[in-house]
Design a protein with these regions (language model features):
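Acidic, low-complexity, intrinsically disordered peripheral segments
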Residues: 22-23, 69-71, 76-81, 268, ...
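A glycine-/polar-enriched beta->alpha junction
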Residues: 34-44, 51-68, 105-138, 146-163, ...
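Amphipathic alpha-helical coiled-coil segments
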Residues: 45-60, 179, 183-204, 215, ...
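Transmembrane beta-strands of outer-membrane beta-barrel pores
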Residues: 74-78, 125-129, 152, 332-336, ...
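Periplasmic alpha-helical coiled-coil/stalk elements that build and connect Gram-negative outer-membrane
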Residues: 5, 27, 163-167, 171-293, ...
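Residues that define the transmembrane beta-barrel architecture of outer-membrane proteins
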Residues: 98-104, 140-144, 348-352
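Bacterial Sec-dependent N-terminal signal peptides
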Residues: 1-27
């Protein structure tokens, strides 16, 4: 490889590195939330959680449909010693016997949810060949058999599945939207953390430039004895502190930018510039409406309903199992046996089966009764927990909506305070330059401006955090008055 090639490779690598390091994007709040829901690792995790629940429900629905099964045993060889009667010696003797067999069958089954029984249709064919002293070949067929098996007094799982499984899937869908709004809430938090860091950094830069200018002015005024030595040292201290603040703000900015880039699954070298949202439109949310939406949409309510149903199912199961159990199996069909395959299906004979089995617990030392009492007590616990969760959620919705409605007024107040603080600082700075304001007044004015800037960004952050938290708790978009479920495509897991 010649030097030109080496130089070219190095140049390309440096170009790629510089291009990567200087990659920059500009994001507003809406775009940040979209990227979070499309690209973040949290969004991928929640999407796969939804798909897991989706396929679980599909499996439940498939189990309600007829199933067709083929059972095959292509070959079985069996060699053994058996006892046989020898007519020549009039005594039993042991003989070696060999057997080869094969079987196949088709079975159609359909569960019947109302009674918990199972309908079935079978068709079987078996082949048997014996070797040894006794040689024979037989085909046994069951061309057709239809039957029904049913637990007469037992637990019916199908009936409870019809109540629980659709509720579970509805909960999974609502959880998906809930977690999507949770990702949006996280995105808002990361966005404003970076916004606060950028504002701090910008203020630190301006403060650094301002303190440097003021210190230079102070030096000139000190030479003509316009300010004291103590005031000059204070200006110098402000300059040093401003430089330290700038360095700390730069570190905090890098951390906040890296955190947002990582959350959005971007390259860690991405430079992010934020477009801050302005004052949001005035919107008042009714606490009663938010509570009603939460009770009908929040997945935590559905989860508590699921827990209550599952506990009631366990009570029913243990109560039924504490008594005797009886089951019925009835079938009618045809069968035949012959030495060859064709005759095995010729003139089949009718085959009938009716069986009733009963299982009666006599002595179990209170095991069944104990299980039933445990299930009943657990049902009471679940109902109490469901009520506690309901009260907790009602409190959370009420407080969040109240904070949101107040936060809109706080944004207007914080914006007004920021404008006043900026004007006050500029006037104090000009008065200091012409010698009509002291250092303490200037420092106090600067601190007030910085505090007002932080309060304004914090007010915006709290507003949007509360807004998306309300969306998460209610699964409702109050801005467009639409349910978030109506805007969701559950097949693809994406907003429409």
């Amino acid at each position: 490889m010649n030097w030109k090639s080496v130089t070219l490779c190095i140049g390309l690598c440096l170009f790629a590195f510089i291009g990567k390091a200087q990659h920059a994007v500009k994001l507003n709040l809406k775009r940040t939330i979209q990227l979070a829901n499309d690209s973040s690792l949290s969004a991928f995790r929640y999407q796969n959680m939804y798909l897991s629940g989706y396929w679980e429900y599909r499996t439940y629905k498939a189990n309600r449909l007829p199933s067709l099964t083929m059972n095959l045993m292509p070959a079985q060889y069996y060699r053994y010693i058996t006892q046989r009667y020898d007519s020549n010696t009039d005594m039993d003797v042991y003989r070696e016997q060999q057997m080869f067999s094969a079987s196949s069958g088709l079975s159609i089954r359909q569960n019947f949810d109302l009674t918990g029984g199972t309908f079935y249709i079978d068709s079987d064919l078996e082949y048997l060949r014996n070797f040894g002293d006794t040689r024979s070949t037989q085909f046994s067929s069951v061309p057709f058999r239809i039957g029904y098996s049913q637990s007469l007094l037992g637990y019916n799982p199908f009936r409870w599945d019809r109540k629980i499984e659709p509720l579970k899937f509805e909960k999974v869908k609502k959880e998906f939207i809930y977690h999507t709004e949770e990702v949006s809430e996280e995105a808002v938090n990361y966005f404003f953390n970076l916004a606060m860091a950028q504002a701090d950094y910008q203020l630190a830069k301006e403060n650094m430039a301002s303190t440097d200018t003021l210190y230079s002015i102070g030096l000139q005024r000190h030479k003509i004895a316009a300010i004291s030595r103590a005031d000059l040292l204070t200006l110098q201290l402000d300059k040093v502190n401003a430089r330290n603040t700038l360095e700390n703000a730069q570190i905090a900015l890098k951390r906040a930018m890296f955190a947002l880039a990582s959350f959005l699954n971007m390259d860690k070298h991405t430079q992010i510039e934020l477009d801050m949202p302005g004052r949001p439109l005035a919107m008042e949310i009714s606490v009663d409406e938010a509570l009603a939406r939460a009770k009908s949409n929040n997945p935590n309510f559905l989860q508590q309903q699921q827990h209550v149903l599952e506990a009631e199912r366990d009570v029913n199961k243990t109560r039924v199992e504490s008594r005797f159990n009886a089951s019925l199996n009835a079938s009618v069909g045809f069968n035949q046996v012959a030495d060859n395959f064709k005759d095995a299906y010729r003139k089949p004979m009718q085959q009938d089966l009716v069986s009733v089995s009963v299982s009666i617990p006599l002595v179990d030392w209170g095991v069944r009764k104990g299980k039933h009492n445990m299930a009943r007590n657990n049902l009471n616990v679940v109902k109490i927990a469901a009520r506690q969760e309901e009260l907790k959620l009602e409190e959370e919705v009420t407080m969040t909506v109240s904070d949101f409605n107040i936060q809109q007024r706080l944004i207007a107040s914080a914006e007004e305070a920021l404008d006043l603080a900026i004007m006050a600082y500029e006037q104090t700075r000009q008065r200091f330059i012409i010698g009509k304001a002291d250092v303490n007044s200037l420092t106090l004015s600067l601190n007030r401006q910085q505090e007002a800037q932080k309060n304004y960004i914090s007010a915006l952050q709290n507003y949007w955090l509360n807004y998306y938290k309300i969306r998460k708790l209610t699964l409702h978009d109050f801005e467009s008055s639409l349910s978030l479920s109506d805007r969701f495509d559950f097949n693809n897991g994406m907003y429409r």
